[in-house]
A protein has these predicted regions:
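N-terminal "arm"/small-domain region of PLP-dependent enzymes with the aminotransferase-like
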Residues: 2-11, 17, 28-94
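PLP-dependent enzyme catalytic core of the Aspartate aminotransferase-like
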Residues: 2, 10, 353-395
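PLP-dependent aminotransferase class I/II
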Residues: 248-324, 329-332
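Conserved PLP-binding catalytic core of the aspartate aminotransferase-like
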Residues: 313-314, 322-357, 372
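Phosphate-binding glycine-rich loop
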Residues: 96-141, 376
Length: 395
C-alpha cells in the first residue's frame, strides 16, 4: 500500500550526502568497490511489516488540504496547556523526573487508584512494547483481534511470539468466543482494543467480564483504551472497574487523542502492582520529558473540558457516520474519533480519490479509516464518497 509513497521514491533516487553526481550515477570506482557485509539480524523481523504512519495530504492547487489519516485531534490543546508548555520549555540539559511523580499523583487522584498501580510512558505504544517484553518470547503465543492497531503484530512479532490473529465479526467487533477458543497452554498475552482501531465498535462490560472469566489467571490481558473518551455507547466496558476486579488485566490509555497531545508522547497504564513492577523494568528511563509531564498534568486538571470537547467530536462523528449511511454505505458503530468504510479491494481507489482532492485518509487494505476533522474536510469526503459510490457501486 506504500509503493507510491513519494518519500520512498525520493530516498531511492537521491544521492547520499557527500557523494558527487558521478559516484551516485554509477562511476567505475563505486562499481568496483566491494559490497559491505550484511549484519545478521533476527529472523523474526521477516515475519511482520514495519509500522507505517498515516500519510500527509497532497497539495492540490486551489484546495485546502486536510489530514484525516492519523486519528489526530484536529482541535489544539487547551489554552492553559499551551501556557504550561511555554513555562516548562526551559532547560533541556536536565533529565526529567523519571518517576513522573506529579503526573502519576494527578492520575491516581483522578482515577482513584494507588501510585503503585500506575506507570507513565512515551505514549501507549511504548506500553505495548514493554508488555510483550515482560510476557512473551519465541516459546509463547499472543492473541489479538484483526484488523486492529497495527502495532500489535509488530510488538508481538518482535519478540518472536507466535501470533494468533482472530478475525473480527462482520460488524467490526471482537469475536470474544473465538479469542477464548484460541487460548492454549502457550498463551501469555491477549490484547483487546475498545473502541477498536480501525473499525470503531466498543466492547461491552458484560462481555469483557465473561471473557476474562475464561482466561487463565497467568495470562496477561491488555485492554487498549486509547480512544475511550470518545465512546458514548451505553454499557461500554469500564476499564477501571475491570482492572480492580481482575489482577491479570492491564489498562492502556494515552494523552494523544482526546487531550490533543500526540506530539508530546504521554501514555499510561493502570494495573495491579506486580504488573506495574514488571513494566517499570522494561520501559525507557527518562522517556517522558518534563514539558510533556507538565502539559499532561495541566490537561488532566481540565478533565471536564477535555471530556466536553471529546463529546463534541463524538457528535460530529455520529453526524458524519449517519451521512455516509444515508448515501448507502455500511458503516460499523463508530465510537472513537474516526469512521471505518469496509471497502475491501476498492480501498486503494477510494484513497486515490481522496488524494486527488487534497484529503489524506488511511487505507488499511480491508477498508479505509477516516479521522474526524474540520467540517470542511468531512464535507469534502462526503462529496468524494457520493461520487465514488455512483462510479464504482451503481450501474
Amino acid at each position: 500500500m506504500n509503493a507510491s509513497d513519494p518519500a520512498a521514491s525520493d530516498s531511492a533516487s537521491t544521492s547520499a550526502p557527500g557523494t558527487s553526481s558521478s559516484s551516485a550515477s554509477g562511476s567505475t570506482a563505486s562499481a568496483s568497490a566491494p559490497s559491505a557485509p550484511s549484519p545478521r539480524l533476527r529472523a523474526a523481523l521477516e515475519t511482520f511489516p514495519p509500522y507505517v504512519p498515516g500519510k500527509p495530504p497532497r497539495q492540490v492547487e486551489g484546495l485546502e488540504s486536510f489530514k484525516l489519516s492519523s486519528n489526530e485531534n484536529f482541535l489544539p490543546p487547551l489554552p492553559a496547556v499551551l501556557e504550561t508548555m511555554v513555562a516548562h520549555a526551559t532547560n533541556p540539559a536536565l533529565y526529567p523526573d523519571d518517576a513522573a511523580l506529579a503526573l502519576r499523583q494527578g492520575l491516581a487522584d483522578r482515577l482513584g487508584v494507588g501510585l503503585d498501580q500506575l506507570v507513565v510512558t512515551t505514549g501507549a505504544s511504548e506500553l505495548l512494547v514493554a508488555l510483550t517484553q515482560i510476557t512473551s518470547d519465541a516459546t509463547t503465543e499472543a492473541i489479538y483481534p484483526w484488523p486492529s492497531f497495527e502495532m500489535y503484530p509488530q510488538t508481538t512479532g518482535l519478540v518472536g511470539s507466535t501470533r494468533r490473529e482472530v478475525p473480527l465479526t462482520a460488524e467490526g467487533r471482537h469475536d470474544l468466543d473465538a479469542m477464548a477458543a484460541a487460548i492454549t497452554e502457550d498463551t501469555r498475552l491477549i490484547i483487546l482494543c475498545s473502541p477498536n482501531n480501525p473499525t470503531g465498535p466498543v466492547l461491552r462490560d458484560d462481555e469483557v467480564r465473561a471473557f476474562l472469566d475464561k482466561v487463565p489467571d497467568h495470562v496477561l490481558v491488555a485492554l487498549d483504551e486509547a480512544y475511550w473518551e470518545f465512546a458514548t455507547e451505553p454499557g461500554r466496558a469500564d476499564g477501571l472497574g475491570l482492572v480492580r476486579d481482575y489482577p491479570n488485566l492491564v489498562l492502556l490509555r494515552t494523552f494523544s487523542k482526546a487531550h490533543g497531545l500526540a506530539g508530546l508522547r504521554v501514555g499510561y497504564a493502570v494495573a495491579h502492582p506486580p504488573v506495574i513492577e514488571g513494566l517499570l523494568k522494561a520501559v525507557i528511563p527518562f522517556g517522558v520529558t518534563d514539558l510533556s509531564q507538565a502539559a499532561a498534568l495541566e490537561s488532566l486538571n481540565h478533565w471536564d473540558e477535555v471530556l466536553e470537547r471529546a463529546g463534541e467530536i463524538a457528535q460530529t462523528r455520529d453526524a458524519f457516520a449517519a451521512a455516509l449511511r444515508e448515501q448507502g454505505w455500511e458503516v460499523p458503530e463508530a465510537q472513537a474519533n474516526y469512521v471505518w468504510l469496509p471497502l475491501g479491494e476498492k480501498s486503494g481507489a477510494f484513497e486515490d480519490a481522496c488524494v486527488e482532492q487534497a484529503v489524506a485518509v488511511r487505507n488499511l487494505g480491508a477498508g479505509v479509516r477516516i479521522s474526524i476533522g474540520e467540517d470542511e474536510a468531512l464535507a469534502r469526503v462526503l462529496e468524494i464518497a457520493e461520487r465514488f459510490r455512483v462510479e464504482h457501486f451503481e450501474d
